[in-house]
Amino acid sequence: MTDRPATGIESLVLDAAPLLVQARIAGLADKYYIPASVVAELRDARARDYLHTLHTTGQIDLEVREPGAEALKMVMEFAKQTGDYAVLSKPDLHVLALTYALEVEAHGTWRIRQTVGGKTGQQLHEERRLEEKRVAQPQSQGAKDAIQQGGRAEAQN
């Protein structure tokens, strides 16, 4: 691995499309991942050479990695809920599942929806925090009013 500046994006999972068109992907992320099924999908010699050159010249830190059975299961179930499962290829599912797996490794399921249209753990936490703040606010305002009223009553005596 070469010394590259941090990009702000830790991990980027590659699909075949940017490699087929030889998009400028170097410098977009700190680390790049690609499922073996996507590498196998690269039948175009230019796309394979492009990926090889990016990696061997140190332009990208690349790891060929599989998503794991649990991540693949979660993505497949979610894709069935959205109705997308029938149109996703095996490499598509592997890209999504690897993205899911990397997110879970880095941050847990905190930022991931479990159901279509559902809220993330982060959103649920924020809603609870705001509700607690809203409930506590009238009580604290009532205490302030009582203190102010008490001060006026004493001043009048």
Name each region found by the language model.
Residues T2-N157:
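Active-site-proximal, substrate-binding regions of enzyme catalytic domains
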